[in-house]
Amino acid sequence: MSAQVIAIDAMGGDFGPRSIVQASIACLSATPSLHLTLVGQPSLLEDLISGLPAADRARLQVVAASEVVGMDERPSQALRGKPDSSMRIALELVRDGKAQACVSAGNTGALMALSRFVLKTLPGIDRPAMVAAIPTQTGYCQLLDLGANVDCSAENLYQFAVMGSVAAQALGVHRPRVALLNIGTEDIKGNQQVKLAATLLQSARGLNYVGFVEGDGLYRGEADVVVCDGFVGNILLKSSEGLATMIGARIEKLFKGGAFARVAGAVAMPLLKRLQADLAPARHNGASFLGLQGIVIKSHGSAGVQGFQSAIQRALIEIQENLPQRLHGRLEDLLP
């Protein structure tokens, strides 16, 4: 297998580079064909990788960046005021062909603005969208947009549906079912943009559009791709993650309540731990910026080692599936 090269914004996120570097080292150990470029403060990064075995160190490069984009900075400041930020340098490595993907846990708005400026969008795409896998009763669905576009036109939603369908196919879903997230399944439900998007999707050739889906239908697995604006999608994503964490904590507390509960917990806990691990946000961390002329994966700023590993793994899959090129090849057929 040919080498995959991923540029890592090592200075982004809430906790600094330590967990990012640990996740990067773990991915190197698990994937012999992987090469990583850590972008950030060289002295700090070199210290964190100083004990790495020579074989792994040979697949790890450090590229200097003198600036860091803060988590609370405006995108305009990152775009105009920090030309040597670790985030920007990582994206420029992708643009220049020195890396095949960029992974960052940094400021979402800044990452989107820089990605659009440095990498540009694919022909026919007005706005990139954030997409991630959401666990359902039957497997997973791809949910987009997750916050990059708070206000969306019907045409934006249509483009998101096209991109989501192609992404789901790249991840192994045959003829993915595409749905619009709505407050009901009847044709009369929804705001004007959702209704107009439905009209566009109903007439689209090559898309398996199945209509509207409600929030509970998403979790029942009624669609493989669920489309909404970024305002709704971000709230849904954060609510899902909070619910999964709360359920796990409540279950653990329940089985510590008394002697009988502890005995029952000892029997049930292995299965419950498996369920908790399957639903854990860290396992599904990593949202893809679809619609760019390059692969960009956004990790949660609060992600730990396992979460950042998941983001790198998503980047690997998209590299292996050549996702931007696949998108480009399908857009001419599916966009009006």
Swiss-Prot record:
SUBUNIT field: Homodimer. Probably interacts with PlsY.
Organism: Pseudomonas putida (strain ATCC 47054 / DSM 6125 / CFBP 8728 / NCIMB 11950 / KT2440)
One example GO MF annotation: phosphate:acyl-[acyl carrier protein] acyltransferase activity
Broadest EC class assigned to this enzyme: transferase
Alphabetical list of PANTHER family matching this protein: FATTY ACID/PHOSPHOLIPID SYNTHESIS PROTEIN PLSX, PHOSPHATE ACYLTRANSFERASE
Entry annotated with the keyword Cytoplasm: yes
Similarity comment: Belongs to the PlsX family.
Gene that this polypeptide is encoded by: plsX
Subcellular location(s) per record: Cytoplasm
Catalytic activity, EC: 2.3.1.274
Signal sequence, renumbered to the chain: none
A Gene Ontology cellular-component term: cytoplasm
Associated pathway: Lipid metabolism; phospholipid metabolism
Function: Catalyzes the reversible formation of acyl-phosphate (acyl-PO(4)) from acyl-[acyl-carrier-protein] (acyl-ACP). This enzyme utilizes acyl-ACP as fatty acyl donor, but not acyl-CoA.
Name by which UniProt lists this protein: Phosphate acyltransferase
Keyword Transferase carried by entry: yes
Superkingdom of the organism of origin: Bacteria
Pfam families, A to Z: FA_synthesis
GO biological process, any: phospholipid biosynthetic process
Keyword set, alphabetical order: Cytoplasm, Lipid biosynthesis, Lipid metabolism, Phospholipid biosynthesis, Phospholipid metabolism, Transferase
SUPFAM superfamilies the record matches: Isocitrate/Isopropylmalate dehydrogenase-like (SSF53659)
Catalysed reactions, as listed in the record: a fatty acyl-[ACP] + phosphate = an acyl phosphate + holo-[ACP]
Gene3D superfamilies in the record: Isopropylmalate Dehydrogenase
